[in-house]
Amino acid sequence: MVSTTQSRSLKAMGEEIWKNKTEKINTELFTLTYGSIVAQLCQDYERDFNKVNDHLYSMGYNIGCRLIEDFLARTALPRCENLVKTSEVLSKCAFKIFLNITPNITNWSHNKDTFSLILDENPLADFVELPMDAMKSLWYSNILCGVLKGSLEMVQLDCDVWFVSDILRGDSQTEIKVKLNRILKDEIPIGED
């Protein structure tokens, strides 16, 4: 488990990096730009929201594969020894550094391979109201799941990441579930020493 001292230290690190080492853009510009991307995808895929979800996830995955390098360079954190520690780093550092939010970690499985992140606030969803035809199948912020999947994979954690609920869809909270499938082995590509 993660001690209270370690948890506070991670939170302080995330806040310090957010305040002093992160270039910031206007929140409204960020939110509206993301909204424009989602709206354009809905138009491009002729309101096939499953395809929009897949595209957002894929975009997020590609971002996550690169974002992890920036995160590790800024924090210089060592490899996490378990998923509990990883969840604390995600919540208290990564989300704080890149989105200035700190999701709550909850709903751990008994064997500690699955947990939920509860987003009390979601900067991607500000100023957003989903149309009725999108409320059942569009995961508006699905890019976040892709970012988590991509970044976790780059640190050798094969995880499934998905939305369970979203306030935009009329749910009481926004919840992202993370399930560890397996720890990947560091392997040297064929033909390289």
From Swiss-Prot:
Superkingdom field: Eukaryota
Positions of S-palmitoyl cysteine lipidation: C80
Listed InterPro entries: Bet3 (IPR016721), NO_sig/Golgi_transp_ligand-bd (IPR024096), TRAPP_component (IPR007194)
CDD domains recorded: TRAPPC3_bet3 (cd14942)
Pfam short name (any one): TRAPP
GO biological process: cellular response to nitrogen starvation; cytoplasm to vacuole targeting by the Cvt pathway; endoplasmic reticulum to Golgi vesicle-mediated transport; intra-Golgi vesicle-mediated transport; macroautophagy; retrograde transport, endosome to Golgi
UniProt keyword list: Autophagy, Endoplasmic reticulum, ER-Golgi transport, Golgi apparatus, Lipoprotein, Palmitate, Transport
One Gene Ontology term, aspect cellular component: cis-Golgi network membrane
Principal subcellular localization: Golgi
Compartments reported by the entry: Golgi apparatus, cis-Golgi network; Endoplasmic reticulum; Preautophagosomal structure
Family under the similarity heading: Belongs to the TRAPP small subunits family. BET3 subfamily.
Further details from the record: Present with 2370 molecules/cell in log phase SD medium.
Subunit and partners: Part of the multisubunit TRAPP (transport protein particle) I complex composed of BET3, BET5, TRS20, TRS23, TRS31 and TRS33. Part of the multisubunit TRAPP (transport protein particle) II complex composed of BET3, BET5, TRS20, TRS23, TRS31, TRS33, TRS65, TRS85, TRS120 and TRS130. Part of the multisubunit TRAPP (transport protein particle) III complex composed of BET3, BET5, TRS20, TRS23, TRS31, TRS33 and TRS85.
Function: Component of the TRAPP I, TRAPP II and TRAPP III complexes which act as guanine nucleotide exchange factors (GEF) for YPT1. TRAPP I plays a key role in the late stages of endoplasmic reticulum to Golgi traffic. TRAPP II plays a role in intra-Golgi transport. TRAPP III plays a role in autophagosome formation. Required for sporulation. Has a role late in meiosis following DNA replication.
Protein name: Trafficking protein particle complex subunit BET3
Designated gene of the protein: BET3
